[in-house]
Amino acid sequence: MSNEVDRMDVDEDESQNIAQSSNQSAPVETKKKRFEIKKWTAVAFWSWDIAVDNCAICRNHIMEPCIECQPKAMTDTDNECVAAWGVCNHAFHLHCINKWIKTRDACPLDNQPWQLARCGR
């Protein structure tokens, strides 16, 4: 066994561990840890369960204010721009879809009759 250790390309510490473990019944582990994790910050990604995350009417992200609410968004923080989901699972800003419904009672994306499923954030 010692001849094999002499011929192998190993570090000094590893060859001593091999020689010690051949003399003992249980292997002795004296290696230091390569690194230790002291703090772990987990990151998660998520998305809404909707077909489109932009309002197809005003082209803004559904969680940002619509073009009607943008001018007053900085000054009036009490009013929220609420999203509206249809039964077709398409989401629009409530202001945008209300204007759309006045001219045409269908979803702007799939042309199905518009039915409100839920409203809110």
From Swiss-Prot:
Protein name stated in the entry: RING-box protein HRT1
Family: Belongs to the RING-box family.
Subcellular location: Cytoplasm; Nucleus
Region named Disordered: 1-31
CDD domains per record: mRING-H2-C3H2C2D_RBX1
Transmembrane found in the keyword field: no
Record-linked InterPro entries: RING-box_E3_Ubiquitin_Ligase (IPR051031), Znf_RING (IPR001841), Znf_RING/FYVE/PHD (IPR013083), Znf_RING_H2 (IPR024766)
Entry text on domains: The RING-type zinc finger domain is essential for ubiquitin ligase activity.
List of residues binding Zn(2+) 3: C88, H90, C107, D110
Binding site for Zn(2+) 1: C55, C58, H93
Recorded consequence of changing K72R: In RBX1-1; temperature-sensitive allele. At 38 degrees Celsius induces defects in ubiquitin ligase activity
Gene Ontology BP annotations: cell division; cellular response to methylmercury; G1/S transition of mitotic cell cycle; G2/M transition of mitotic cell cycle; heterochromatin formation; mitochondrial fusion; mitotic intra-S DNA damage checkpoint signaling; nucleosome assembly
Ranges of compositional bias, category Low complexity: 16-26
Keywords recorded for this protein, A-Z: Cell cycle, Cell division, Cytoplasm, DNA damage, DNA repair, Metal-binding, Nucleus, Phosphoprotein, Ubl conjugation pathway, Zinc, Zinc-finger
Sites where the protein binds Zn(2+) 2: C66, C69, C81, H95
Annotated zinc fingers (RING-type), start-end: 55-111
Pfam families, per the entry: zf-rbx1
Molecular-function GO terms, alphabetical: cullin family protein binding; protein-macromolecule adaptor activity; ubiquitin protein ligase activity; zinc ion binding
Functional pathway: Protein modification; protein ubiquitination
Function summary: Core component of multiple cullin-RING-based E3 ubiquitin-protein ligase complexes (CRLs), which mediate the ubiquitination of target proteins. Recruits the E2 ubiquitin-conjugating enzyme CDC34/UBC3 to the complex and brings it into close proximity to the substrate. Also stimulates CDC34/UBC3 autoubiquitination and promotes the neddylation of CDC53 and RTT101. Component of the SCF(CDC4) ubiquitin ligase required for ubiquitination of the cyclin-dependent kinase inhibitor SIC1 and for the G1-to-S phase transition.
One GO CC annotation: SCF ubiquitin ligase complex
Self-association state and partner proteins as the record states: Component of multiple cullin-RING ligases (CRLs) composed of 4 subunits: the RING protein HRT1, a cullin, a linker protein, and one of many alternative substrate receptors. Component of SCF E3 ubiquitin ligase complexes containing the cullin CDC53, the linker protein SKP1/CBF3D, and substrate receptors containing F-box motifs like DAS1 or GRR1. Component of RTT101(MMS1) E3 ubiquitin ligase complexes containing the cullin RTT101, the linker protein MMS1, and substrate receptors belonging to a protein family described as DCAF (DDB1- and CUL4-associated factor) like MMS22.
